[in-house]
A protein has these predicted regions:
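Active-site pocket scaffolds in enzymes
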Residues: 1-97
């Protein structure tokens, strides 16, 4: 398990740490949202109000021999573990070096 990312909100002190066995993390933001999408509770989703951390192999892995392989043979199983640890800044462990 490797430390992959930390998101921190200085206004609230909320923290999300991401630890994973995957070699990469894709970060997606809600920059394309304009308030036209409404959630089940009636909340609208607007620009800069959300993000996601998606752990995965690198998207170009099949084309880059120096990247970790994404080949999975028919008899093989794939296992991956990702942990999202939620905290406040008062309870933060130090970042790995």
């Amino acid at each position: 398990m490797t430390f992959a990312a930390r998101a921190y909100d200085p206004r609230t002190g909320r923290v999300i740490d991401c630890l994973t066995t995957e070699p990469g993390v894709q970060v997606y933001t809600s920059n394309g949202m304009n308030g036209s999408v409404v959630g089940s509770s009636g909340t609208t989703y607007r620009q800069t109000e959300a993000f996601t951390l998606e752990t995965q192999h690198f998207p170009e892995s099949p084309n880059k021999p120096n990247f970790p392989s994404t080949e999975l043979k028919p008899v093989q199983e794939f296992h991956s573990t990702t942990i999202f640890r939620f905290a406040t800044d008062a309870s933060l462990p130090p970042l790995p070096r």
